[in-house]
Amino acid sequence: MNNLIDTIKKIENILYSLERILKQECHNLLKSKTSNEEILELIKRKKILFKKLIILSQDRLCLEKEYNIFPPYESNNKLNNYWKKIINTCLILRKLNLKNKIIMNKKFYLNQRFLELSSSYKKSVTYNLDGNLEI
């Protein structure tokens, strides 16, 4: 049972780390001068944490089968409390992710509008897959 508790604690820690990264990403997106490298570094860190989270989730599922106990772990108060924290953190992550998505979409829209207005009205200016301008 201690293995399951340790695994759930690790999942909780990873989720808190993801929360900090998403808040930092939001802050960077709101700044007017943020380099792409800063955003890409945050994305790399998120990918690493998601890989760890997937592995821990698989371990958790195996341990649940072994101990024959499943979420929300009502028979075990300690596990139940950790699980509630995980659920709350996941809800916060969902809100932060949606907020970041909205900010990125607005920035992209404003950049696209500026590029269209700054060039002649007959030329279409867009970004290609490499992030370079195409006219």
Curated annotation (Swiss-Prot):
Pfam family for this entry, one: FlgN
Predominant place of localization: cytoplasm
InterPro entries (alphabetical): FlgN-like (IPR007809), FlgN-like_sf (IPR036679)
Keywords: Bacterial flagellum biogenesis, Cytoplasm
GO biological process: one example: bacterial-type flagellum assembly
Subcellular location: Cytoplasm
GO cellular component annotations of the record: cytoplasm
Family, similarity comment: Belongs to the FlgN family.
Protein name from the UniProt record: Putative flagella synthesis protein FlgN
Originating species: Buchnera aphidicola subsp. Acyrthosiphon pisum (strain APS) (Acyrthosiphon pisum symbiotic bacterium)
Lineage, top ranks: Bacteria, Pseudomonadati, Pseudomonadota, Gammaproteobacteria, Enterobacterales
